[in-house]
Design a protein with these regions (language model features):
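Structural recognition of alpha->loop->beta junctions
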Residues: 109-127, 268-276, 336-349
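A structural motif corresponding to the C-terminal end of an alpha-helix
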Residues: 39-50, 212, 272, 305-316, ...
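Acidic, low-complexity intrinsically disordered segments
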Residues: 1-214
Length: 521
């Protein structure tokens, strides 16, 4: 049996880091698709199955590939491409299997583009499907009715990829989130019960990724810190292992702001070389948190916990959402001021959406505020009719704020503030050896910011480096890496806002002024 597994090309988006990757030139895309590589590892040893793996972000699809089955996975952002790929292969009489996040959340739509549909986790259903296929009894739909024991999930088979193509390696230590936020569809995919792999399993996967060439590992858990005792033990194990390496591995992950209230956890994260943590703050308005069933976060003051994370040299990447019922036109200025006061360099600004089958979706539908035929992208528009903001205020306010945050003068102020906040430098590692690639990367970054950027960005670059040297020379390397990351967000915010969002005045579009950001229209 020959199976062609395809990870569809991801459209250009805020998270893709295309601008930064293009400068360095070593990596072709941000991270590998863990799901498909896990499917390969799930194959029963007594079956004769040959896999061909294609990451379309790395290499083109071979449309005339001789195979018995095509397997496609994908997120919501990839669904349009998933449908196109499936149609092309079905025209060639190749049966197609589809699974993943989108298929689980929107099975009705996914079923239309495939011959075999996988809903939910596939650790148990994929091996069963392979056996059914061999026996000639494969079903149309395979649905995992209960959440699996994640300890049964094997390490992804990394032998099908090349480390040089990826900036990060993505691994998963746990699934499930005990929270039940009204707008979040995670609990439908992974459940509310927290399930973790064993520490031995996780460390084997980390060591395996490192052996394949991983320099940075992203733990894709929706909430990395749920079981405090488990997290402490895992971080201690990572530290012990990392200290044995000539070139220690760096990490990043996702969590809630509650970690900032736990200084022991924050210090361990810093000692384990966690460089960036995405924090789903969403809003600083307590009423907004209550309205979407996220009241458990009200007790944590973001003005205190976020600077505490920064003090340990960890970059807090703040996830903000606009468009809650309690949001007024003042929300954009409030977010800007908050990011300034907490010296948070990086932030995403999304518009509140109601994914299918979430409590928010049902509430908006019941209240007559749901746009049923919504065809937009989650990070650009919304399927909700806002309450205290006009669609114009919400739509353009988000775009203008997003663009403003990454203007040189505003980013420079926040980044220098962050650098000044850093007080802790782990002294448990020997001086990191300088590899040739890192030297070449730094040269490329300096070349880019010296010769290929607008004058205000170039001035910001040198201002930040001079200030960094004054604050603490040990932060120079971090500053250069952050500036590389910054370029992607600056470049993307200009392209996305001006060209795609009608902020450039082309085609007769009205260009809104920044009074929206001051709560005035």
């Amino acid at each position: 049996m020959k199976i062609y597994l395809i990870n569809p090309k991801t459209p250009e988006n805020f998270w893709a880091m295309r601008g930064a990757l293009d400068i360095v030139g070593k990596h072709k895309t941000l991270m590998q698709n863990t799901a498909l590589l896990t499917l390969i590892a799930l194959t029963p040893g007594d079956l004769d199955v040959e896999y061909i793996y294609c990451d379309e972000n790395i290499a083109p699809i071979h449309w005339d590939m001789g195979c018995d089955l095509v397997g496609i996975t994908g997120y919501t952002l990839q669904f349009e491409r998933m449908g196109f790929i499936s149609a092309r292969f079905r025209e060639r009489c190749r049966p197609v299997a589809v699974g993943g996040i989108y298929a689980t959340i929107n099975p009705e739509n996914a079923k239309k583009i495939c011959d075999h549909l996988f809903i939910g986790e596939a650790e148990y259903t994929w091996p069963q499907f392979l056996r059914d296929w061999v026996n000639g009894s494969a079903k149309v739909v395979y649905k995992q009715e209960t959440f699996i024991d994640i300890k049964d999930s094997p390490a992804p088979d990394l032998s099908y990829i090349k480390a040089k193509n990826y900036h990060y390696f993505s691994l998963q230590t746990s699934r499930g989130c005990p929270n039940n936020c009204d707008f979040c569809d995670v609990v439908r995919v992974t459940g509310r019960k927290y399930r973790s792999k064993s520490i031995n399993q996780i460390m084997l996967e980390v060591k395996n990724a490192h052996a394949f060439g991983a320099e940075t590992i992203f733990f894709s858990d929706d909430n990395f810190v749920v079981n405090r005792k488990f997290t402490i033990e895992l971080l201690q194990e990572i530290i012990r292992w990392n200290r044995t390496l000539d070139m220690p591995v760096s990490f990043s992950t996702q969590a809630t702001v509650m970690i900032g209230a736990d200084e022991e956890i924050v210090k361990l994260l810093a000692d384990a070389r966690f460089r960036v943590i995405f924090l789903g703050l969403e809003t600083i308005n307590k009423d907004c948190l209550e309205e979407v069933n996220k009241g458990q976060m009200v007790q944590y003051d973001p003005f205190q916990v976020i600077p505490r994370i920064s003090r340990y040299g960890i970059i807090p990447f703040i996830g903000m959402i606009v468009g809650f019922d309690h949001d007024t036109p003042a929300v954009f200025k409030e977010i800007e001021d908050f990011l300034d006061k907490t010296a948070s360099p990086f932030a995403s600004i999304s518009v509140l959406n109601a994914p299918n089958h979430t409590p928010l979706y049902e509430r908006m539908k019941r209240d007559g505020r749901l746009i049923e035929d919504f065809r937009g992208f989650w990070h650009l528009t919304t399927n909700i009719i806002p309450k205290q903001l006009t669609p114009h205020e919400l739509y353009f306010g988000q775009k203008l704020l997003f663009k403003k945050l990454y203007e040189p003068e505003h980013f420079e102020r926040r980044m220098i503030g962050w650098l000044k906040n850093v007080k802790y430098f782990p002294d448990i590692y020997s001086t990191r050896k300088k590899d040739l690639f890192r030297i070449v990367m730094i040269i490329k970054i300096f070349y880019h910011f010296t010769l290929r950027v607008p004058a205000p960005v170039r001035m910001m670059f040198w201002n930040i480096l001079k200030e960094t040297w004054k604050i603490d020379p040990r932060l120079i390397s971090r500053a250069v890496s952050m500036l590389l990351q910054y370029w992607h967000y600056y470049d993307f915010s200009h392209k996305e806002s001006d060209e795609k969002m009608g902020l450039d005045g082309k085609d007769g579009a009205q260009v809104p002024d920044e009074s929206i950001l001051m709560g005035k229209t």
